[in-house]
Amino acid sequence: MSVRHRIASSGVFGAVTVAVAGPIAGLGFSRLIGHLPTAGPLSRLAAAVVLYGAGLAAVGVGYLALTGRLGDLRPVRPDAEEVRLVAAVTAVLVLAWVVAVVGLAVLGVPFAGNALTAQADGGFRISLVLLAGLSLVVIAPTEELLYRGVVQASLYDVTSRRRAVVAASVPFALAHVPTLYADTSEPSAVGLSLIAVFGLSLVFGWLHARTDDIVAPTAVHGGYNCLVFCLLYLVGV
């Protein structure tokens, strides 16, 4: 049996391997920033995001190529129903975020941001606008490619779709732990935000399981992140 067939026949092994290798490759690619002619904090931020995303994409595309599944990346043009679904889910998620942030602030409950929004806290508010754009073209596409298009999809043949959604959401959430700790070292705040990230991942995973394509989860993921960053900029965070 060839390497390709051995890997393809083990959905769990492939999913775990990709889930671990993706963030490692992303961090490895990010280290290349020291060799790039970045002029300031904004260009360094953009380079870091792009390089990390390139690492995720390299692992995801590499695995699909190795297993003969590159055809899975062919985008499916969404129909009117899917467009309405994307718009509705994005609106609900953003509204839920607003309610949660206001509610936690009123109750005085701390929660963690991440290493990206920490730049805005450091006086670079314009970075939020940059991140809004990067969410649409880099962050959401590469994360959804890896965690939904590869990890979750690889589990469909070995377990139920519901379990695949949950299983793929675990490494997605854990991959965000370092960025959450970059904003605060308070364990309870990090834990609360980690639960929120896990919840978001469940929604993205549900969309993939429903549509069998990464277009819908990518659109919702990117739209949600973009709108949140824009709202943070508008309120002066």
Predicted region positions:
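Alpha-helical transmembrane segments in multi-pass membrane proteins
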Residues: 13-67, 119-123
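Residue-level signature of transmembrane alpha-helical entry/exit and packing/kink sites
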Residues: 6, 10-15, 44-52, 81-89, ...
